[in-house]
């Protein structure tokens, strides 16, 4: 019985997501220029990004992508998660 309760508690905690970090409206507007809010994958990706990264981390990742063409793995994971969820 204890094992079952422990497993249930762990499962419940794993389902919890962190609250979104604060991002300025201009960051979302910039994101939506390339990924429209009318697309459910884009909206999901934005939600995942704001939970996984601070605005400062996100901006650094965008700057790095523009400068070096390298995508931050957290952005890739967020988008992949949303694409897979849409087609699941």
Roles of regions detected by a PLM:
Residues 1-3:
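Positively charged n-region of N-terminal signal peptides that target proteins for export
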Residues 17-19:
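Bacterial signal peptide processing site
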Residues 32, 43, 47-88:
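Intrinsically disordered, glycine/charged-rich N-terminal periplasmic/extracytoplasmic linker segments
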Residues 24, 38-42:
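Membrane-interface starts of transmembrane alpha-helices
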Residues 21, 25-27:
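Short amphipathic alpha-helix starts
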Residues 12-15:
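C-terminal motif of bacterial Sec signal peptides marking the signal peptidase cleavage site
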């Amino acid at each position: 019985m204890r094992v079952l309760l422990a497993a249930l508690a762990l499962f419940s905690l794993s389902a919890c997501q962190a609250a979104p970090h604060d991002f300025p409206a201009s960051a979302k507007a910039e994101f939506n220029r390339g990924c429209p809010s009318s697309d459910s994958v884009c909206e999901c990706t934005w939600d995942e990004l704001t939970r996984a990264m601070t605005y400062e981390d996100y901006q650094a990742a965008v700057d790095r992508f523009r400068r070096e063409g390298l995508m931050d793995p957290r952005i890739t994971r967020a988008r992949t998660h949303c694409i897979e969820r849409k087609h699941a």
